[in-house]
């Protein structure tokens, strides 16, 4: 009788031990949205100086300036949060980076005229140049966001190939810079230390804290 009790006690103990693991090898963990950062590095660990300071923007620059503008655009961008997350996961890009580009380029679409910038040259939430990229879909559609995010990933991969010894952070920053100004303009790490890239990373960190 005693041996039987000991046996079942051991079985219960083993079961409890296995149950202490958060998930088995056959199960995938359910990641909190704030933990998802895609395939191109964790932006929360990346250094940035924020928007460039100059004589005309002493008060609205640096990390505080970037965060201020990101917060101002939050209300306009919030309705696209689910869409941004879907597109981000499809392309393995941090949704916060997509949100940051939307903030920087179109203020969440609030300054666009039928999807176009004031010169009629760039289209959509992420502002694709019509001559370079030939935008598709409605300006605030999943099709547009997917096209633009796909272009961003192409640029990141091109930088990875061109500069294989660069760090993960440099590859992402290089891809962002190439998305804005082209790959040809990038030759050294100093070329990716620019206003656009630093501003995007700072804004992205803000949006990551807002659960993007």
From Swiss-Prot:
One of its GO terms (molecular function) is lysozyme activity. One of its GO terms (biological process) is defense response to bacterium. Keywords: Disulfide bond, Glycosidase, Hydrolase, Secreted, Signal. Residues 1-19 form the signal peptide. Strong expression detected in the eye and weak expression in the testis. No expression is observed in any other tissues. Disulfide bonds join 39-92, 53-61. The active site is at 105. InterPro entries: Glyco_hydro_23, Lysozyme-like_dom_sf. Its EC number is 3.2.1.-. It is found in: Secreted. One of its GO terms (cellular component) is extracellular region. It is an enzyme of class 3 (hydrolase). It comes from the Eukaryota. May act as a potent antibacterial protein that may play a role in the innate immunity. Belongs to the glycosyl hydrolase 23 family. This is Lysozyme g-like protein 2.
């Amino acid at each position: 009788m005693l041996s039987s009790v000991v046996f079942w006690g051991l079985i219960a103990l083993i079961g409890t031990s296995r149950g202490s693991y958060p998930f088995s090898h056959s199960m995938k963990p359910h990641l909190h949205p704030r933990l998802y950062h895609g395939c191109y590095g964790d932006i929360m660990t990346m250094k940035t100086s924020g928007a460039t300071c100059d004589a005309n923007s002493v008060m609205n620059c640096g990390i505080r300036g970037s965060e201020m503008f990101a917060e101002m655009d939050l209300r306009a961008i919030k309705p696209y949060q689910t869409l941004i997350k879907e597109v981000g996961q499809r392309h393995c890009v941090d949704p916060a980076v997509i949100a940051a580009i939307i903030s920087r380029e179109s203020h969440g679409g609030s300054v666009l005229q039928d999807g176009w910038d004031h010169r009629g040259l760039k289209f959509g939430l992420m502002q694709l140049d019509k001559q370079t990229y030939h935008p598709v879909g409605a300006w605030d559609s999943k099709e547009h966001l997917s096209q633009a995010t796909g272009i961003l990933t192409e640029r990141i991969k091109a930088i990875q190939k061109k500069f294989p010894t660069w760090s993960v952070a440099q590859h992402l920053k290089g891809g962002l810079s190439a998305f804005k100004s082209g790959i040809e303009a990038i030759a050294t790490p100093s070329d990716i230390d620019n206003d656009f890239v630093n501003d995007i990373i700072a804004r992205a960190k803000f949006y990551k804290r807002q659960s993007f």
